[in-house]
Amino acid sequence: MKGKVLLGMSGGIDSTVSAMLLLEQGYEVVGCTFRTFDSIKESCLAREKGCCSVESIMEAKHNAEQMGFEHHIVDFRETFRRCVIQNFIDEYMAGRTPNPCVLCNSHIKWGELVRVADELGCDYIATGHYARIRERDGHLYLAAAADTRKDQTYFLWMLTEDQLRRTIFPLGDLTKDQVREIARQHGYETLAEKKESQEICFVTDNDYRTFLRANVPDYDERVRAGEYVDKDGKVLGTHQGYVNYTIGQRKGLGIALGAPAYVTHIDAATNRVTLGTNDDLLATELRFRPMTNDTRLTTNDQRLTTNSPMTAKVRYRSQAVPVTNYQLPINNQTGSLFFREPVWGVTPGQSVVLYQDGLVVGGGIII
C-alpha cells in the first residue's frame, strides 16, 4: 500500500476517475464531499444539480460505495460562507469582479482537506483538478496539465508549497477525452457523457445580480441608477446600478452611442460606469496585491529566476502573455507587471498568475 489518500469528491467524472486511478496505483482511498451551503438564497441547491448539490453529494457517496472505500460528508457551511461567499459579495459591492474558485481552492478544498486528512490519518490529499506538481531547485511548483485546454493552474495559484507537498493530481497527465474513456471502461457511461457545468456553484444560472439582491440587506439603498461617462468624465446616459456591469461588457448596456461601447471602468464610490472603445480595454501594465502568506512573489524569492522569461495570465481563458518587467510586492504592498504587447480586459478583482517554464511562480489579485 502506497499510503492513505483523502480524495475530494464532487460526484462528477473527474473526481470519480481520480478515485479509480488512485486505487489502481495501490493507494488506500477515503472520499470526502463538502456540504457548503443549503439555503435557497445561497442557491446551487435550488437547481438541484451541480458540484455542491444534494444530488452530487449523494452521487459521490454512491460512487465511493461502489468502489469499496469509505466516504465522509463534511459540513463546511460556516467556513464557506465566511471565506468565499462573503468575499464574493464584498468584491462585487466594491465594484470589482471576484473569482470565488481561487479562494475556495486555497481555503476550503485544501485548507479544510488537510485538516480532515490529519483527523483521519491520511498521508495525502487528492482532487480531480487538471494540474501537475514539479520540483525545481528544491522547491515544489504547480505545473500546467498535459491537457492545456483543461489546465486549472490559474485557479490554484494560491496553494502553498506545504499544501503541494501533500497533494496528488491523478489527472495531471491525462486529457479530458482520456478521462471520459476511463470512465466508460469502468461502466460509468452516463457520467462520461454528462455535460460539465461552468457555473459558480452557489449562484443559480450564473445570475450573480439576483444572488446579490437576495444576500445584501441594503441592496436597494446601495445599488441605484447612476451615470454612464466617457474617459473624460462627460455624461453619456444612465445605468441601472454599477453592480450590473463588468469590465469588457458590451451587451445589455441599454445605451446607443452610434458605435460599439464597452465597460472600461467601474467606480462604486461615485456610482459611475465608464464606457469606451475596444482599444480602451487594452493595457500594457497592471497593479496587483498579494493574497497569500507563502513566500512567493517577494523580492528575495529564489523561485523567480532571471534567466528565464516570465508570462502572465489575467483571465482563465486567456493566453499567457510575456512580461517585460515587474515590481514585486514588498511587505504586503502592491506590485506591478509590464507587458510586451497590450493585454485586453484587465479586470480588478480577477487573478493574475505568473508562469516560468510552465511552472506557477506566483500570482495576485488585480487592482
Name every feature range the model reports, one short phrase each.
Residues 1-157, 168, 176-178:
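ATP-dependent adenylation/nucleotidyltransferase module used to activate substrates
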Residues 126-133, 138-367:
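AMP-forming adenylation/ATP pyrophosphatase catalytic core
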